[in-house]
Amino acid sequence: MLFYKRFYFMFCCLLIVLFGCKSTTSPTLTVSGLAFYNDANSTIENIKLTVVESAKMVSCNLVEPQSYCGTGFPQARYQGADLVLSWQTSQGQIITRPVLLKQPQKFDASKRYAAVIKFTDPTNFEAFFTVNPRPF
């Protein structure tokens, strides 16, 4: 009889552990595009965004003032890789800087996002994610 009580107790504990626990996977940001916006008053040239680890890159030769250059790509989960951005100003100055592209704290995991590099002037930029207006 004591064996059955112990068995019953252990069985109940096992059920509580198995069915009482919940998997907590954090949602991932899905990225399917990149855009270089030029809000500066001069042309930005030879823009190149490089993933440091793999040396893969995306580039755009010329972005006129108040316009953009963008591309789409197959959707991928954002993994926070180290990125480096380089570009040339209309005066010929070549600038290279690391990019801090943070995943938003709140986002809709059912939507696809585009990474945005927005030049605020010829020598500075902001980097962020926005919902991809063309999520195909």
Feature-to-residue mapping (PLM):
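Bacterial N-terminal signal peptides that target proteins for export
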Residues: M1-F9
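Tryptophan-paired
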Residues: L49-S90
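Bacterial signal peptide processing site
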Residues: K22-T24
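Extracellular beta-sheet/turn segments enriched in Thr/Pro/Gly and aliphatic residues
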Residues: I95-F136
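C-terminal motif of bacterial Sec signal peptides marking the signal peptidase cleavage site
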Residues: V17-G20
